[in-house]
């Protein structure tokens, strides 16, 4: 069996004078969670729409499960778009069964699977409510269920956590991890870099319509390592040592009097040398390399913070 469930190769797409995708290539491993990252307007949603046969590329190819992607393959993809699209006036259960039947399930099988999901997410009381009676977060739970109910091998979630409070966002994260562990492959587009570190095996970062960074999350973080270490220590307050290390962050003492520091050592200094100098001042409790976060890497690569992006979404 091919280890890649989906591969996009040299995909480009233009809308009038706007280039949405410029020679984009990604490989999605079977059974992995793949993060598609980038600002609004970077090209993420255009790529997702090409994968779902909503729009066609101007050039390039998309391969699904070892063969060129066709319209028939779309039935094996579950897609949760950022723009939610349920019918407000219909009853929740009636609509969910209808959508499941469109994906090839019989009415009996659809109802059985849906009721199991409704029980799992503790929303059985919503079955006979109209969608317009539910909050945005409740509606998103329903649409999540209708996306996964036919058990497609590939699931695509576009900004799945928007509109959720922290508790429900954590619930959805657990469900996504369970789906991966059950053998599903997940692609999700997000601005939430913390979610990337929690969930993703691999990522591709798109900026100005091109892939500027890709790989396994752990490898990407190691690629951007910068001689920074985390130290938790007892004893006196640690002082920096010229030409050996600087202290970039120092926390207040905890209940036991332990302090946590972030240190940046000089490149020529070995870890053994650093530790030797540290124990002269303090009693180390934990000491480990501190890899940059995905947010830090995003800022360094793209040159702007996610929270300050004002790029229009031309996708």
Each language-model region and where it sits:
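Non-catalytic alpha-helical coupling and interface elements of nucleotide-dependent molecular machines
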Residues: 104, 229, 303-307
